[in-house]
């Protein structure tokens, strides 16, 4: 890097920071935080528990956004000042240090951009994830289980919790399907763009001839809705099926029909839950899954209508990412058009760079 390149980078980052300030309005955030703090001083604040909880969540979000922005702006201002001084004094040591720290500065500004992108209506929600293998039997079922582990490892890395709703073992290996919740701040915001088909190319561990195979799995993401969001479901539009639960990994087989499957006729959506030994609890969880999927479907329709587009098909034609393990190693995302070589780390849950890249590409 030279002086001109670094100078242009600083101009670009300053421009981004100015645009961020226009969007988030730091002074208005400070005023809103003051208003919330006064509201919390009211003795009656905790009488409405749900409202108090939402207010606290908003306070945490605003504080984090303001702190992230302020820290980034201060670092940028300091770098601009140091750069000018180092140029005037012909201080090669300081210039070299600034060049080395340039990627950190870029990343800091990007983090603020991502904070803004995660301020949508449901972005702070938990995420309900459903993974279904495509055609191909054992190959695709094994691939679905690899994706399942990838998301679980991502959740662990972030300190998020996960809860299985439905799990069906594969015939020889892998899974026939899984539905689970990842619980953590902005879980849905980060994962919402994972909707679509994920493609794997590898030398099959199940093929004695060690041939290269291509497998597909579908991932669907929806927000876990708060109880205060009302989604009406007409009973005549659904069918309930009850069956015996096998449990994750084939353990704890129930002798009673506690597992629940719900089919929604107007949309064709099918959800099922066998997480609990109680049929009543499984039915409640399955209904929550159905409501979340219907809510997500309605949002997609509204967004497509607003953009005057046809709704993109989340099906076997909507491939969002390829994971190639042979003859070379690469993960490539179709939305950000970015390729990554750290395939092993990605499949072990190191997907933040991919998720953030897609958020920025779709901004």
Swiss-Prot record:
GO terms for molecular function: translation release factor activity, codon specific. The modification N5-methylglutamine is found at residue 251. The keyword Protein biosynthesis applies. InterPro entries: PCRF (IPR005139), Pep_chain_release_fac_I (IPR000352), Pep_chain_release_fac_I_sf (IPR045853), PrfB (IPR004374). It comes from the Bacteria. Peptide chain release factor 2 directs the termination of translation in response to the peptide chain termination codons UGA and UAA. HAMAP family: Rel_fac_2. This is Peptide chain release factor 2. It comes from Helicobacter pylori (strain ATCC 700392 / 26695) (Campylobacter pylori).
């Amino acid at each position: 890097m030279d002086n001109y390149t670094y100078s242009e980078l600083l101009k670009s980052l300053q421009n981004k920071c100015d645009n961020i300030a226009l969007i988030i309005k730091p002074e208005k955030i400070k005023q809103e935080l003051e208003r919330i703090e006064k509201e919390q001083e009211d003795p009656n604040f905790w009488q409405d528990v749900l409202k108090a909880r939402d207010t606290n969540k908003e306070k945490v979000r605003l504080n984090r956004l303001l702190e992230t922005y302020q820290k980034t702006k201060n670092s940028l201002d300091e770098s601009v000042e140091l750069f000018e001084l180092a140029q005037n004094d012909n201080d090669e040591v300081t210039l070299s240090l600034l060049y080395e720290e340039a990627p950190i500065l870029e990343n800091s500004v990007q983090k603020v951009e991502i904070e803004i992108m995660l301020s949508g209506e449901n972005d702070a929600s938990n995420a309900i994830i459903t993974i279904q293998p495509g055609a191909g039997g054992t190959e695709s079922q094994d691939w679905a289980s690899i994706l399942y582990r990838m998301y679980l490892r991502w959740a662990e890395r972030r300190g998020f919790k996960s809860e299985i709703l439905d799990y069906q073992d594969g015939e020889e290996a892998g899974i026939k399907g899984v539905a689970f919740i990842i619980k953590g701040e902005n879980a849905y915001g980060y994962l919402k763009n994972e909707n679509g088909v994920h493609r794997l190319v590898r030398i099959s561990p199940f093929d004695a001839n060690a041939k290269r195979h291509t497998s597909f799995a579908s991932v669907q993401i929806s927000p876990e809705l708060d109880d205060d969001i009302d989604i009406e479901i007409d009973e005549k539009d659904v069918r309930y099926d009850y069956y015996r639960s096998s449990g994750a990994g084939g353990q704890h087989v129930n002798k009673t029909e506690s597992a629940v499957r719900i089919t929604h006729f107007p949309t064709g959506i099918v959800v099922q839950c066998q997480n609990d030994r109680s049929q009543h609890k499984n039915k409640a969880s399955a209904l929550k899954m159905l409501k979340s999927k219907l809510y997500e479907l309605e949002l997609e329709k509204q967004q497509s209508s607003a953009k005057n587009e046809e709704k993109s098909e989340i099906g076997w034609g909507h491939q969002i990412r390829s994971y190639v393990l042979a003859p070379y190693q690469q993960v490539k995302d179709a939305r950000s058009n970015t390729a990554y070589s750290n395939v092993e780390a990605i499949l072990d849950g190191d997907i933040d760079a991919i998720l953030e890249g897609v958020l920025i590409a779709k901004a």
